[in-house]
Regions:
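Hydrophobic beta-strand residues in large extracellular and virion-surface proteins
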Residues: 46-48, 136, 209, 216
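Charged/polar low-complexity intrinsically disordered segments, enriched in acidic residues
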Residues: 156-224
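A general nucleic-acid interaction/assembly signal
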Residues: 127, 133, 137-177
Length: 224
């Protein structure tokens, strides 16, 4: 059963955020919720930890309420009791997987990695995101790599070629910053743009093309 609280009292603890993009909310999702609230819509209650008001599920809803109604905003919450942070984190993953903004593959890989770090049993982590244990292990192996310091990091679709590797600093930078598009797509896009004379050849762009040419030559020299 939900109760009413001041939205400003709720705590966004990013350690409990089950997605890979910590400190970052989806601006499109928040904007959609703001518009819904402005026309009188009522969003589902936010799930919080009863002990300290940390948000388990509802970061975007809380942000939208504060944006629309200010620091005096009221919000409906469901307060739950958790024995420990790992239990709270698993519930956050379960709730985020079952409704609202979908958790992408990189989000799920991040969630599994953090569950492993928190010593959450495989079966518990798998059930939270709607997978069986074997499927989860195979998915995790295809969607993670390890840094030189030993940290396991999730990979987007664009970084899947690095799965299972110990990453160099350059590879780690790519893995952390790449999005869901595979690199081959960008190659095709650039070729098409160049053929269509659609690239604005600023000094910076020309400099980057020269840099690209050098990288391509290194690759071609290696396959001759």
């Amino acid at each position: 059963m939900s109760t009413k609280m001041k939205a400003i009292e709720l705590v966004m603890d990013w350690n409990m955020w089950p997605r890979q993009s910590a400190q970052t909310l989806d601006s499109t999702n928040v904007a959609r919720m703001r518009e819904f609230l402005r026309v009188g819509g009522i969003l589902p209650p936010v799930v919080i930890n009863a002990k300290d008001y940390r948000i388990v599920d509802g970061f975007h809803r809380t942000r939208a309420h504060l944006d629309v109604f200010g620091d005096d905003a009221d919000i409906q919450v469901i307060a739950k009791n958790y024995a420990k942070d790992s239990e709270m984190f698993v519930d956050a993953g379960r709730l985020n997987s079952s409704h609202g903004l979908p958790m992408g593959p990189k989000d799920r890989a991040h969630f599994i990695a953090k569950c492993r770090k928190m010593k959450v049993p495989y079966i518990v982590a798998a059930e939270a995101i709607g997978m069986n244990v074997d499927s989860m292990k195979k998915f995790f192996a295809k969607r993670t790599a390890r840094t030189e310091s030993g940290e396991v990091i999730p990979l987007s679709a664009g970084g899947r070629g690095l799965a299972g590797k110990v990453l160099t600093p350059a590879q780690e930078h790519f893995a952390r910053t790449s999005n869901g598009a595979v690199p081959e797509m960008y190659i095709s896009m650039l070729i098409n743009a160049l053929r269509a004379d659609a690239v604005q050849l600023s000094d910076r762009t020309i400099s980057r093309l020269i840099e690209l040419d050098k990288e391509i030559q290194v690759i071609l020299d290696g396959v001759e």
